[in-house]
A protein has these predicted regions:
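C-terminal segment of classical bacterial N-terminal signal peptides
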Residues: 15-29
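Short linear motifs in intrinsically disordered/low-complexity regions
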Residues: 11, 21-22, 34, 40
Length: 369
């Protein structure tokens, strides 16, 4: 899901940044009194992939089920809507013609189509996961995945016997690089000498490439495999090879119960339920530049721990989670990159704009294609 293509979900925001600029684009600002539905709420969702993909889309579907219980109504949905206007617009309009007045998207590539739809249907509220467009009746949202990946890194550092960790990454974009760096910083909190060897697959969801990358990292000595790709394949390979891993998107113990130490998971219901209630109540004011969600507000969280994480280490990780929930910043200074260049000064925190365009790595991270 990227401007470079057609990139898959959850990862396109980074590519919209100009140096120092905002990462969301906007439509005209919301009216002072906000957006209010004209009829009773009827909600529909457009899924990028199948609801049982084991990752990104399934996390949204699981959130849908929880949201239905919270708001007391069913949510319609359609699966496998590709990032193409010729598919997105008809899918959304089909629901709108049936009375839907709240439409939720789940892909970066829906951004422009949702902008057009929001302008065409001013009485419909639009939300889009990992989108980049916003307006008076449109809000994009994404989570700060580096927070949960930092905690997964702590689990990896605690479980590793060698201090050599591997990481299967999709593409070398800021939104992926910030998870790699956070994973490394978390691991180094438990073991200051921990290293993270990274292989990029060049794809968001390619189990064949993910299997090859995970196997190569293990062959190179990694005894824990982290990931920022859509499928559970790296965890499956870790279990097959007798090492450990940390998952992404969902709790991947389902696929590798012996190997998976913990997972960085989406908890979309924690954000979407209150956001939908605001829309339903009336006077909704979408965030001007979209919602960049912290863990405490329902972005991501962790699921685990596996038995390889000692209880005392699990307690430390839980304490760090509590600190993050209270406002601890992962990218607080002083912080230098692997070449010794200062990236965050003492007393400062890395800006959101710099997060989205992150192209540097902390000490101990080794990247390869």
């Amino acid at each position: 899901m990227q401007q470079l293509r057609t990139l898959t979900p959850g990862l396109g925001l980074a590519m919209t940044i100009a140096a120092g600029g905002a990462f969301f684009t906007t439509l005209p600002a919301a009216a002072a009194d906000g957006f209010t539905l004209k009829d009773k709420p009827k909600i529909a969702m457009l899924y990028f992939g199948p609801k049982n993909d084991g990752g990104w889309t399934q996390a949204f579907d699981e959130a849908r089920v929880k949201i239905e219980k919270e708001i007391g109504q069913k949510i319609q949905f359609v699966e496998n809507v590709p990032e193409d206007a010729s598919a997105i617009k008809p899918a959304a309009e089909k629901f709108i013609q049936r009375g839907a007045n709240i439409v939720i998207g789940t892909a970066f590539g829906y951004s422009d189509s949702f902008k057009d739809l929001a302008a065409k249907y001013p009485d419909v509220a639009f939300l889009n996961g990992s989108g980049t467009t916003n307006g008076s009746n449109l809000e994009s949202f994404y989570g700060r995945t580096y927070e949960s990946q930092y905690l997964c890194g702590m689990a990896a550092g605690a479980a590793s016997k060698t201090g050599k960790l591997g990481f299967v990454a999709a593409n070398p974009f800021g939104v992926v690089n910030w998870t790699i760096n956070a994973f490394a910083l978390g691991a180094q909190k438990m073991n200051p000498n921990a290293t993270v060897n990274v292989i990029y697959t060049g794809a968001w969801n390619d189990p064949v490439k993910e299997r090859a990358a995970a196997a190569a990292l293990i062959d190179q000595g990694a005894d824990v495999i982290g990931q920022h790709v859509d499928s559970p394949t790296p965890q499956i390979v870790a279990q097959e090879r007798g090492v450990y891993g940390t998952g992404h998107h969902r709790d991947l113990r389902q696929f590798a119960p012996k190997a998976t130490l913990c997972s960085s998971v989406w908890v979309w219901d924690r954000f979407l339920t209150p956001e939908l209630k605001k829309i339903i109540a009336g006077g909704w004011k979408p965030a001007q530049y979209g919602a960049f969600i912290e863990m405490k507000d329902g972005g991501t969280d962790i699921a685990g721990f596996g038995p390889a994480v000692p209880k005392d280490k699990a307690a430390l990780i839980t304490a760090e989670r509590d600190a993050i929930m209270k406002g601890k910043q992962i990218y607080a200074g002083p912080l230098a990159d692997r070449d010794g260049k200062e990236r965050v000064a003492k007393g400062a925190v890395l800006s959101d704009a710099d997060l989205w365009k992150m192209d540097w790595f902390v000490k101990g991270v080794v990247t390869q294609k």
